[in-house]
A protein has these predicted regions:
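Feature recognizes metal-dependent phosphohydrolase scaffolds
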Residues: 1-104
């Protein structure tokens, strides 16, 4: 969470990197408590990453994407009607390759 402001991404010219301050301002202006994004694998990751003071979650569902050894993940969303809240919990989908190691 050390990035501040908006910067060009090293991935390509169209993409941007944005810091925690941008996320915080965007959420405050739009009445949001969480942003969920996808479409970016991180090598060796658990398939999700919580960032920007818990305001941003990156989730990637494809396991072992391009042989990166990453786990996939999904977000489980449930509702608490008493407190009018949504609960969001990551669930890791472990790599089939690693799960099958040693199985004959």
């Amino acid at each position: 969470d050390s990035v501040f402001g908006v910067h060009e991404s090293p991935r390509n010219l169209e993409a941007k990197l944005f810091g925690w301050n941008v996320t915080k301002t965007f959420c405050a202006r739009n009445g949001l408590g969480l942003i969920v994004r996808s479409h970016q694998s991180k090598q060796g990751s658990l398939g999700f990453e919580v960032m920007h003071d818990n305001l941003l979650v990156r989730v990637f569902s494809a396991r072992d994407y391009e042989s990166h050894g990453n786990c996939g993940a999904v977000l489980l969303v449930s509702r608490d009607d008493e407190r009018d809240l949504l609960h969001v919990r990551p669930q890791v989908l472990h790599s089939l390759t690693k799960a099958l190691d040693g199985v004959t």
